[in-house]
Swiss-Prot record:
The keyword Transmembrane helix does not apply. GO terms for molecular function: metal ion binding; methyltransferase activity. The keyword Protein transport does not apply. It comes from Streptomyces olivaceus. Pathway: Antibiotic biosynthesis. It catalyses: 8-demethyl-8-(2,3-di-O-methyl-alpha-L-rhamnosyl)-tetracenomycin C + S-adenosyl-L-methionine = 8-demethyl-8-(2,3,4-tri-O-methyl-alpha-L-rhamnosyl)-tetracenomycin C + S-adenosyl-L-homocysteine + H(+). Belongs to the methyltransferase TylF/MycF family. This is 8-demethyl-8-(2,3-dimethoxy-alpha-L-rhamnosyl)-tetracenomycin-C 4'-O-methyltransferase. Its cofactor is Mg(2+). One of its GO terms (biological process) is methylation. It comes from the Bacteria. Mg(2+) binds at D185, D212, D213. O-methyltransferase involved in the biosynthesis of the permethylated L-rhamnose moiety of elloramycin, an antitumor polyketide. Mediates the methylation of the hydroxy groups at the 4'-position after the sugar moiety has been attached to the aglycon.
């Protein structure tokens, strides 16, 4: 695939995944202070009724940057997303691999496919306050539907692997091997912590961590608590007012490895 053809393909994929082409009606729209005129679909500020992703165009641009950078730099490892909704961001990662002719890396698609876990007395306090499970009528997307969405783009193949179940159950033993990009979209404190604890030690130096829900207090607290525990100081960069990312350094990678005796 020529460079021009690759750029056209990936640009069209982003517009189709976000449905910027036909502009389906939102189920719900979120307006942030200072953004009264912002386009919700560019910034991921709505829950679309039809589109295959709610992350918005800017976060897909960032995802493309991260995946293409690890490909160009030869950073070893697969790609993983935790919390995939209708699958759009994971589909896009597979599209980037296809566009660049990468036939070795896999895309790991981790989700309960049942929506958000119900909170209880033993759940984190901030998670209890949000009660996101009450929105599972929108947030729960069955595995069969996500697989079908991959298939619609011609991207369901052996390079796509699914990890169905709650993160605390599936991620510790997930057979991912090394990772180059980890994209976390679990919203909750506990979901974010489960993903960081289990996936960060597998992330290759030079790889990327993307936090979709950093604007949510519970998620942001989980990120800073985790980084504080392990002394991670890699600079955090903002994407669009909601998501952030950072590049994993060799020093941070060493801090996550068990001490040798």
């Amino acid at each position: 695939m020529t460079e021009d053809a690759r750029d056209l393909y990936l640009d069209l994929m982003k517009k189709v995944l976000t449905n910027l082409i036909y502009r389906d009606a939102p189920i719900q729209t979120f307006v942030y202070d200072g953004e009264p005129d912002a386009d919700p679909r560019l910034l991921g500020r709505d829950w679309p009724s039809v589109a295959h992703t709610m992350v918005g165009l800017k976060r897909l641009d960032n995802l493309q940057y991260c995946v293409e950078t690890v490909l160009a730099d030869g950073v070893p490892g697969d790609l993983v997303e935790t919390g995939v909704w209708r699958g759009g961001s994971s589909i896009f990662m597979r599209a980037v691999l296809r566009a660049h002719g990468d036939t070795a890396r896999r895309v790991w698609v981790a989700d309960s496919f049942e929506g958000m876990p119900e909170v209880g007395a033993d759940s984190h306090a901030v998670d209890r306050e949000m009660r996101l499970h009450e929105h599972n009528g929108v947030l729960a997307v069955p595995l069969e539907q996500v697989r079908a969405n991959f298939e619609r783009y011609g991207l369901l193949d052996d390079q796509v692997r699914f990890l169905p179940g709650w993160f605390k159950d599936t991620l510790p033993g997930a057979p991912t091997g090394r990772l180059a990009v980890i994209r976390l979209d679990g919203d909750l404190y506990e979901s974010t912590t489960d993903a960081l604890e289990n996936l960060m030690p597998r992330l290759s130096p030079g790889g990327f961590v993307i936090i979709d829900d950093y604007a949510i207090d519970a998620c942001r607290d989980a990120v800073h608590d985790y980084r504080g525990r392990y002394g991670i100081s890699d600079p955090i960069s903002e994407i669009d007012g909601t998501g952030v990312f950072w590049r994993h350094t060799a020093a941070s990678a060493r801090s996550l490895q068990p001490a040798t005796v």
